[in-house]
Amino acid sequence: MLILISPAKTLDYQSPLVTTRYTRPELLDYSQQLIHEARKLSAPQIGKLMGISDKLADLNATRFHDWQPDFSPENARQAILAFKGDVYTGLQAETFSEADFDFAQQHLRMLSGLYGVLRPLDLMQPYRLEMGIRLENAKGKDLYQFWGDVITDKLNEALAAQGDKIVINLASDEYYKSVKPKQLNAEIIKPVFLDEKNGKFKVISFYAKKARGLMSRYIIENRLTKPEQLTAFNSEGYFYDEQASGKGELVFKRHEQN
């Protein structure tokens, strides 16, 4: 079973590390090509392209400039511990045991605009380059054209390595668009999280993102290997709704939080 999640814009390079183990990202040659393109942009151009403040644009211009491919624990950090958005609040990798990291390293993949596909223990240097950004490059007008089949091929490699044909899609649409489902040698299962608001169940972005992290953690902690095992997920009040599920979707609901 291979779990896909999105990265986060918020990064943490300060907290104490809970593991000293690390691996190197497998697609750094591609990352270097993107860095080459990104370095051509001035801070104001970055700000406009990404829709961010001058301060953030300056920070990311500096990050692109400082980026270099010789990753070490001194200048980089394991991806699963560097990302700090809502998904990662639910995942809480800072409380993982070494055995949890082992399982995650095999079964969890983070999709990334700059790094393509990251394993949990892959070192990464700080960056901001969302998959939906229209960064022109030698292969086309945006990152989807840049990555082409590369991400899908990498995921197929991971599936073959574990002798498995199930993908659990917990990534956002923006990131999942970088995957070509028809070329993926897998059955794709998409958990959907609905929260009750004014008597109606719907996707509430903040809660749904955190729930994707909670589900990832649930799979990792319990060493789950079959999609039907996911239906027992009940973290933070969610419950499986069999009637609402179907067509590759597992629907989980939660009553209004008081």
Curated annotation (Swiss-Prot):
**Membrane-spanning ranges:** none
Q: Which InterPro entries match?
A: YaaA (IPR005583)
**First and last residue of the signal peptide:** none
Which Pfam families does this entry report, sorted A to Z? H2O2_YaaD (PF03883)
User: An example Gene Ontology cellular component term from the record?
Assistant: cytosol
Can you supply a Gene Ontology BP term from the record? response to hydroperoxide
As for family, the record states: Belongs to the UPF0246 family.
Q: Which NCBIfam families match?
A: PRK02101.1-1, PRK02101.1-3
Q: Which PANTHER family match?
A: PEROXIDE STRESS RESISTANCE PROTEIN YAAA (PTHR30283:SF4), PEROXIDE STRESS RESPONSE PROTEIN YAAA (PTHR30283)
Q: What name goes with this protein? A: UPF0246 protein CKO_03380
The organism encoding this protein is Citrobacter koseri (strain ATCC BAA-895 / CDC 4225-83 / SGSC4696)
What high-level taxonomic lineage is stated for the organism?
Bacteria, Pseudomonadati, Pseudomonadota, Gammaproteobacteria, Enterobacterales
